[in-house]
C-alpha cells in the first residue's frame, strides 16, 4: 500500500520506518528538516515516569516504552549525567513521603542524597534517579539514517493538503499542534486541546551544575538539563515557559510569535521571560543568578485540556475512518509503542 505520514517529528518518523518494511511510505514535513518543532524545544529527557506522580497512567505508559527507546537510539544517549528529582518544601502537589511511595509502587529506582547546588531550605527531599537524556542532534542524525535505510520518501518544506486523501491508501496524521488541521472534513473527530506558546531558555551555568539534570517537583517549578555536547543547559519552568494558551480545535498565535516558532535557538529574541526564569530558579539554586543567557527557543506545545490536576501526558493513537489514523504524541519515549499501534491498526484493515 501507499501510505502518507504527515509530520516529521519523532512519532511520524518512527511510524514511517516501521511501516516501510511492508509498504511504500511518504513522509511530509512542513519545515526544512525533521525534528524541528516541539521535538526540538525539548528537555531531551527519556521519561521513565518519575515526572508524573499524579498520573499513574502516564507513568505506566512511559515506563513500559522506556527500554525500547533506549535500545533503538542507544547512540544518542548522553553518558555521565546524574539525574535528580527534588520535592519542593513549599507548594508541591505531592509531598515527599507520597513521592517515595509513588516511586516504590512503580519500581522506579532512587537514592536519597544531598545536592550541594540546591538551597537546602527550599526542598524537602532530593532523590538521585535512574533516568537518561538524549542528544537531539545525534537523534536527528540517527533518524535520517533509519529513514534512508528503510526507503521512506521524505518531502521537506511541504504542507500536506486534502489531496493526500485521494492519492494514498492510508494517511497517518502526526502533526502534534496541528493534528486537527487535516480533519476539517471530520468535525466530529476533532478534539479540543490546550495549546501553549512556550519558550525554553538556554543558560551557561556555574561549574557546580556540570553533568547534572535537576527537576524540582511537583508543581509550578522548573527543571535544568544539559544540552548534548554543549556547555549550556536548557531550562523549563512550568509557569514562565508559557507566554499564552488557549483551549480549542486550533492554536491562537499572536503575530509577534510567528517569526520565532520552530526556529531553534534564537540569540537575543525580541522578547523573553528570562528574568522570570532567573527569579524562579534562584529560589532553589543560589548561584542561578550567575548564569549567562545564551538564547531561547519557541514552539507550540499541545496537551489534553483539563489535565492540570494530574499533569497527564498520554500518547493517543486513534482510527478516524477506514484510511485515516491520528497520533497525538505524549512523551518521546512512547514513539515506538505508538508506531506499533499504528501498524496493528493498518494490519487489521487489510
Where do the model's predicted regions map?
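Dinucleotide-binding Rossmann-like beta1-alpha1 core, especially the glycine-rich loop
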Residues: 43-118, 122-125, 261, 265
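Helical element adjacent to the flavin cofactor pocket in flavoenzyme catalytic cores
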Residues: 127-165, 170-183, 335-343
Amino acid at each position: 500500500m501507499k501510505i502518507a505520514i504527515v509530520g516529521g517529528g519523532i512519532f511520524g518518523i518512527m511510524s514511517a520506518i516501521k511501516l516501510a518494511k511492508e509498504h511504500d511510505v511518504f513522509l511530509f514535513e512542513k519545515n526544512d528538516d525533521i525534528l524541528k518543532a516541539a521535538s526540538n524545544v525539548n528537555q531531551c529527557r527519556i521519561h521513565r515516569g518519575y515526572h508524573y506522580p499524579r498520573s499513574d497512567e502516564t507513568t505506566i505508559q512511559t515506563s513500559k516504552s522506556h527500554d525500547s527507546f533506549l535500545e533503538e537510539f542507544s547512540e544518542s544517549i548522553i553518558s555521565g549525567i546524574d539525574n535528580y528529582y527534588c520535592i519542593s518544601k513549599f507548594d508541591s502537589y505531592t509531598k515527599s513521603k507520597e513521592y517515595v511511595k509513588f516511586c516504590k509502587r512503580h519500581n522506579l529506582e532512587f537514592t536519597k542524597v544531598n545536592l550541594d547546588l540546591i538551597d537546602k531550605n527550599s526542598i524537602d527531599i532530593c532523590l538521585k534517579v535512574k533516568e537518561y537524556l538524549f542528544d537531539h542532534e545525534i537523534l536527528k542524525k540517527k533518524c535520517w539514517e533509519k529513514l534512508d535505510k528503510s526507503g521512506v520518501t521524505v518531502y521537506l518544506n511541504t504542507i500536506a493538503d486534502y489531496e493526500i486523501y485521494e492519492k494514498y491508501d492510508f494517511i497517518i496524521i502526526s502533526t502534534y499542534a496541528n493534528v486537527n488541521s487535516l480533519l476539517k472534513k471530520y468535525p466530529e473527530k476533532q478534539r479540543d486541546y490546550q495549546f501553549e506558546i512556550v519558550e525554553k531558555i538556554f543558560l551557561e551555568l556555574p561549574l557546580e551544575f556540570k553533568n547534572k539534570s535537576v527537576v524540582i517537583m511537583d508543581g509550578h517549578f522548573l527543571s535544568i538539563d544539559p544540552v548534548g555536547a554543549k556547555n549550556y543547559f536548557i531550562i523549563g519552568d512550568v509557569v514562565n515557559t508559557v507566554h499564552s494558551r488557549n483551549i480549542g480545535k486550533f492554536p491562537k498565535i499572536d503575530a509577534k510569535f510567528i517569526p520565532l516558532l520552530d526556529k531553534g535557538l534564537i540569540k537575543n529574541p525580541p522578547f523573553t521571560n528570562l528574568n522570570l526564569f532567573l527569579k524562579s530558579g534562584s529560589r532553589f539554586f543560589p548561584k542561578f543568578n550567575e548564569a549567562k543567557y545564551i538564547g531561547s527557543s519557541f514552539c507550540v506545545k499541545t496537551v489534553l485540556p483539563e489535565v492540570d490536576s494530574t499533569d497527564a501526558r498520554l500518547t493517543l493513537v486513534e482510527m478516524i475512518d477506514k484510511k485515516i489514523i491520528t497520533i497525538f504524541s505524549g512523551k518521546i519515549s512512547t514513539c515506538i509503542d505508538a508506531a506499533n499501534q499504528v501498524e496493528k491498526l493498518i494490519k487489521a484493515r487489510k
